[in-house]
Amino acid sequence: MDTNGKAIEIITGRYGKGTSFENNIVNSIFGELNTKEKFKLYFYWYNVIHELGHGIMAFNCESRPHPVIEEQFVNEIAVAFWLYYGEEEKINELSSIVSYALSKFICPAKEGVSHIEWAHENWGTDEVMNFNNYGWFQMNCVNDALLKRKCLELALIQAGVNNINVQPQKTLIFSKLEETTVSDIISQAAFLLREWGVVLPDVHNSFDNDPNRHMSKIIDVYSGGYL
């Protein structure tokens, strides 16, 4: 996709600003101990790169895969990015968060059916989009990416990035994760990924009071509308 006149908006849900029902959903995923810190690590640190991954696919992949496959790919990009640029302590904490969350979801798939197979079969139906089932699918995608530990170069090639220019490895340290940190994480990640050869337009972020609303959208900068 041509970047001219376009931008990426990454929308992130706020912790504790939703309804009691929405907030209770968060607590059920992350547990009652250090819930806010776990939420911020997952959504303010990890998931913003996941969402940026959708932007990478939109502007670099000539033929985007099925949404199920793209979800797996963008998690592999996010994990690969933080394995290359992240603090090991945060990667380990992410793994613990995902393991705990998976223990709380009820598996909707029959025995022997993978999360990818199940999602392919049910994509576009209410079966996928209820909270338990989509959460189970998404956390399995993250877990699979953590197990694969794919290198960043391969993850970007898989996303359709051409003429990759491998960059020096370094550690991006974010000692405190707050709403104000999110734009810094996104801007640093976008800068580094462009150095790798990734085609990206401007990337913006916004927040939503629903703690479960996390997504990325392509914006027409002339009309202000979503594409």
Map each language-model feature to its residues:
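Glycine- and acidic-residue-rich phosphate-binding/metal-coordinating active-site segment common to enzymes
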Residues: P67-K90
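Active-site recognition of the HExxH zinc-binding catalytic motif
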Residues: Y46-F59, E71, N75, V79
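Alpha-helical solenoid repeat scaffolds
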Residues: N212-L227
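Soluble non-cytosolic domains of exported or imported proteins
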Residues: T35-F43, N47, R64, V68
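Long, well-structured alpha-helical subdomains associated
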Residues: Y85-D210, Y222
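Amphipathic repeat-derived elements
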Residues: F43, I49-M57, N205, N209-R213
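Hydrophobic alpha-helical membrane-insertion segments
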Residues: F59-S63, Y84
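Active-site scaffold of zinc-dependent metalloenzymes
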Residues: M1-K40, G55
